Amino acid sequence: ASQKRPSQRHGSKYLASASTMDHARHGFLPRHRDTGILDSLGRFFGGDRGVPKRGSGKDGHHAARTTHYGSLPQKSRDGRPQDENPVVHFFKINVTPRTPPPSQGKGRGLSLSRFSWGAEGQKPGFGYGARASDYKSTHKGLKGVHDAQGTLSRIFKLGGRDSRSGSPMARR
C-alpha cells in the first residue's frame, strides 16, 4: 500500500484496502474455515466473517472493518497474544483428553511435561507468520497430535516396563 501511495495518490487507499481485504477474505477464510483455530484467527484478518461469532454485535463488526484496512500489519502483530490463545486452547482440547488414565502416573507426568514443551515450540510459528503459515501450521499441529500420541504410547510402554527398575529417566 505504501508503495502505491505516491503514484496513485487518488484511489490508493481504496485500492489497497480492497485488495488486502479480498485476499484476506477469499484467500484465507473459506478454505480453512472449518478448522476452528483459523476461525479465531480469521477474526483478525477477515474482520466481518469471524466477528459475529464472537458475540460482540454490530459495533465490533464495524470497528473491525473500519480499523481493519489501515492497520492490517499492526493488527496481526498486536494480536499475537490473542492469536496464540486459540492455538494453546486447540492443543489442550485435542491432547489432554487423550492422555492415558492416571494409573500410569509416572509416565503421564513425563509425557505431559514433554508435550507441553512441544506446544510451546509451536507458538512462535503461529504468532510470527500467522497469515502465511496458518494453513501449514494447523496441519502440522494436527499431525503433531498424532505423532505425540505415538510418542506418548511409546513413553507409556517404556514407563510400564521400567517401572520395576525406576523411571525411564533414571535408567538413562
UniProtKB/Swiss-Prot annotation:
Keywords, sorted A to Z: Acetylation, Cell membrane, Membrane, Methylation, Phosphoprotein
GO CC aspect terms: myelin sheath; plasma membrane
Residues recorded with modification N6-acetyllysine: 123
Main location, first listed in the record: membrane
Modified residues (Phosphoserine): 7, 12, 19, 40, 56, 76, 116, 163, 167
Xref: Pfam families: Myelin_MBP
Ranges for region Disordered: 1-21, 45-116
PANTHER family found in the cross-reference section: MYELIN BASIC PROTEIN
Family of the protein in this entry: Belongs to the myelin basic protein family.
Quaternary structure and interacting proteins, as annotated: Homodimer.
Protein's name according to its UniProt entry: Myelin basic protein
Source organism (scientific name): Equus caballus (Horse)
